[in-house]
Amino acid sequence: MWRLTGILGRALPRLLGPGFRGITPKPTSSDGSQTTSPTLPLTRLSFDRSGSHGSKRSRDPKCCGWKDAFHWMSAHVSPNTLRDAISWGTLAVLALHLARQIHFHAPLVAGPQPAERSWHSPLYRFLSSSWWHPHSSLRRHVLPRSDCPAPRNTGLREPRQGQEDHPSAPSQCLPSDSSLRSGLLNLPEEEPSDFDFLHASRDFASQAKAAEAHPPGGKNEQDKAKALPLEEAVTSIQQLFQLSVAITFNFLGTENIKTGDYTAAFSYFQKAADRGYSKAQYNVGLCLEHGRGTPRDLSKAILFYHLAAVQGHSLAQYRYARCLLQSPGSLSDPERERAVSLLKQAADSGLTEAQAFLGVLFTKEPHLDEQRAVKYLWLAASNGDSQSRFHLGICYEKGLGAQRNLGEAVKCYQQAAAMGNEPARERLRTLFNVEAAGPSHLATTGLKSFSSPSLCSLNTLLAGASGLPHASSTGNLGLLCRSGHLGASHGAPSRTIPSLERSLVRLGFG
């Protein structure tokens, strides 16, 4: 700005000419009348345009002074020169206002900035440069005071919140006009080196804070954290691939079972079981137990049943517990309790075979519990097991775990007989014959014609008499585990093979 004022000061006297330099304003007396200064050479003024009236106007005190000087200047100065001076001055003022607006609105557009960098705006750097004199008045009036805190833009960004919190309190960051002017006039002079030192110190402080916020070990921890999800993803893909291969081998085994190639089927089951697939492990146990595609080995079958049972396979849990409980000579108490616990897990999961086995098991020592026996028999009968329905009729007829009710027993026998249960039909014929002979004969001989539920009668259930349905997602060998006509040899044909093959359509899926 001081350069602009200097240029104007040197240009205007040259434009006005030597005739205007001697003109000075008339002093005004106390009574309001104007007096002519003796140093003002009015005789040098001449107006060509005024004509004869020029002498009259020069002698009129109201027309003398600055008014005559203005008319004389406007007559001798070119209008283009005045227009250029006004235009350049206006552009300079607009440029300063524009820079000031950029100074205040740039932090709002860029978002919140740290306090130590809030004054590093374009206007601040522009006025701090070497182009401007360090002691200029424009620099003092535009740049903030060094002892004044940096203005915060939170009040501009959230005016409503500030007004709600302090509706009557005046703004503390914006001083009044008089205090601002007095403070700017008393602003101490600073050298350009001070600004450079201030910038360097603030840059160093920001770099130190950044170094504290990101220690050397933090980058390694972030790299490790990014590497962990990648390793987990790779592991998941590998596990999925292994599972897909195991499912494929198990499916090929079931297809070979349908074609009668038990050796190839057992080989595929073994490959899938080696990859930890529970359904294939269960199928290997079935082949080992019944000698299909491999010599019969009950101990190995129990081992594979146990491997599948640990993974939660309900049929494997049932077969493993059943094999243990059917060999009580070498079974210890902890193993017996473990077998019963696995049976309960399978029965609670809805497996009908486990429910029927527990219903009979709880009618015998050392697991005698008549109420629980009736409970599990009722569950198995509700799931469509005709043998459990027949056993439930025996409990009602004898009063085992339930109140004795011959009518309810006959109803259970009829339901089991309608489902094709032959023992229920025989019991109904016996009851009808005794009833025809007389009530007294029923009381003496009726209860001696049958015995309570036993594991021997349960073997009929396991031999396939009830035809229990199997879910297609179990991946088992269908009725192979319930066929009583399967031999130990893996090459001998059997009459029951066609029905067995028809039951293998749902294998290996899920």
Swiss-Prot record:
It comes from Mus musculus (Mouse). This is DAP3-binding cell death enhancer 1. The TPR repeats bind to and activate EIF2AK1/HRI. Protein kinase activator that acts as a key activator of the integrated stress response (ISR) following various stresses, such as iron deficiency, mitochondrial stress or mitochondrial DNA breaks. Detects impaired protein import and processing in mitochondria, activating the ISR. May also required for the induction of death receptor-mediated apoptosis through the regulation of caspase activation. Residues 169-181 have a biased composition (Polar residues). InterPro entries: ISR_Activator, Sel1-like, TPR-like_helical_dom_sf. Signal peptide: none annotated. Residues 24-101 form a propeptide. One of its GO terms (biological process) is response to iron ion starvation. The record marks H141, V142 as: Cleavage. Disulfide bonds: none annotated. TPR repeats lie at residues 213-245, 246-278, 279-313, 314-351, 352-385, 386-423, 471-499. Gene3D superfamilies: Tetratricopeptide repeat domain.
